[in-house]
């Protein structure tokens, strides 16, 4: 089972396309929707939904995947639920770069203080990070600097922030999932 978390643009047709692409490596892909506007509520909702999906699944090696803001959540929720994560262009600092787009960006700071201390050290090796060199939203060199001590980084030379096409990374994801 692969659990897919969308980014800030939850209505993007690219989300459906990514789900279809993910089905090439696992026919059981679950799309979990969340508001994107209320971080504390989103975190509670995502933990509950992901935990429920894991409990209902026979897959002994489920994977959670997200793009942008979905990558932020996939890393954390996957860690908290004990499953591997694949994150594409994760938004590591939504409290800074989501200001003006969501109601309470400061809640991300609060969430960060409530998570397990040094969670990336404890999560080392359980997350695969794919970063675009053409990300028009985030500086992915900063993202790489923050994550490369803990996770394998794959650089993509063609996609932009929304990562419409993930197919070139499916085999790496499949190998990582196993």
UniProtKB/Swiss-Prot annotation:
Pfam family, one: UPF0227
Gene3D superfamilies per record: alpha/beta hydrolase
SUPFAM superfamilies in UniProt: alpha/beta-Hydrolases (SSF53474)
Tree of life domain: Bacteria
Cysteines joined through disulfide linkages: none
Family of the protein in this entry: Belongs to the UPF0227 family.
NCBIfam families in alphabetical order: PRK04940.1
UniProt name for this protein: UPF0227 protein PBPRA2397
Naturally occurring in which organism (per UniProt): Photobacterium profundum (strain SS9)
């Amino acid at each position: 089972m692969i659990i897919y978390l969308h980014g800030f643009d939850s209505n993007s047709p690219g989300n459906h396309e990514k789900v279809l692409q993910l089905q090439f490596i696992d026919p059981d892909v679950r799309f979990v929707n969340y508001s994107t506007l209320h971080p504390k509520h989103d975190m509670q909702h995502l933990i509950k939904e992901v935990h429920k999906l894991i409990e209902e699944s026979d897959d002994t090696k489920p994977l959670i995947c997200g793009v942008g803001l979905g990558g932020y959540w996939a890393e954390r929720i996957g860690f908290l639920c004990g499953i591997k994560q694949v994150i594409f262009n994760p938004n590591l600092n939504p409290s800074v770069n989501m200001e003006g787009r969501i109601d309470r960006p400061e809640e991300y700071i609060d969430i960060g203080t409530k998570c397990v201390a040094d969670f990336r050290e404890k999560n080392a090796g359980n997350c695969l990070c794919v970063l675009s060199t053409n990300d028009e939203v985030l500086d992915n060199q900063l993202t790489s600097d923050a994550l490369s001590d803990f996770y394998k980084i794959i650089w993509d030379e063609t996609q932009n922030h929304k990562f419409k096409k993930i197919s070139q990374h499916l085999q790496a994801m499949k190998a990582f999932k196993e």
